[in-house]
């Protein structure tokens, strides 16, 4: 049985060390941030809900890494890795979790 490699036109099946490093950093950042947010939530420091994606870091970072500038992302929960890979800053993430008007959702999330 021969296995054929299927590669979408214009895409590579290979990742550079730099791309792999960016994906790893996104995964690690997701885990650290969500661990901290959960502690804050359980301690009553966050008024909204937290929907962590613990255990799903690779999926989200991989999706984000595979997207280009033309792709539209409309995430809801457990999508922190996609946000980070698409360039959302940790400051923007924090502003959103704390419901600040300067955040991406203007405090309405």
Give residue ranges: language-model regions.
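Conserved acidic/glycine
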Residues: 1-59, 65
């Amino acid at each position: 049985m021969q296995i054929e490699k299927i590669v979408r036109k214009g895409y590579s099946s290979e990742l550079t060390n730099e791309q792999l490093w960016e994906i790893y950093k996104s995964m690690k950042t997701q885990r650290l941030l969500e661990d901290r947010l959960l502690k804050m939530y359980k301690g009553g420091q966050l008024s909204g809900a937290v929907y962590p994606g613990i255990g799903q870091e690779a999926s989200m970072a991989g999706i984000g890494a595979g997207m280009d500038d033309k792709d539209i992302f409309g995430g809801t929960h457990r999508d922190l890795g996609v946000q980070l890979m698409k360039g959302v800053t940790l400051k923007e993430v924090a502003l959103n979790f704390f419901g600040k008007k300067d955040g991406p959702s203007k405090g309405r999330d």
